[in-house]
Amino acid sequence: MEIAHSINKRQSNLYLIVIILSGIVFFIPFLGRVHLFDWDEINFAESAREMIVTGNYHRVQINFQPFWEKPPLFFWLQVASMKLFGINEFAARFPNAITGIITLVTFFLIGKKHYDEKFGMIWALAMLGSFLPHLYFKSGIIDPVFNYFIFLGIYCCANWIEGKKQNGKFALLAGFLIGLAT
């Protein structure tokens, strides 16, 4: 019994490694090869750059004017990336590539929990091979980060409502995650 558990654990770890490496191979290469092209990409990267220039990380701004339309989390992630990689296209898009990898891992773990490892792997690979998510995870727009936290918040809320987690911790976590997105 112990050997079977050990083999299953190794197989699960192997699946996770394959998913993470696949995400790295699919989402990270050539992030900075193309100029920022979309209004959102350009302005979001500029907002992060302006945070660095002014040192004001509490207020999102464009052209040094307040920009209240978007929540700050994504811009903070871009700032961290720009501080690590410099102010460039790669740094503006890197947070979404990491979010893409984390999304794949999350899908695998949720699929494994509710069905089995095979389902989790198929779900993660289906997401990996889908055109629109692939495009989003290689962009510098807010949607992947926003969608990830909204998805997790709804998932936590659904578990709480179903009664799997009767205490309020899942409800609080759902609110916190949705709050991060918005």
Language-model regions, residue ranges each:
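Membrane-integral, polyisoprenol-dependent glycosyltransferases
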Residues: 2-182
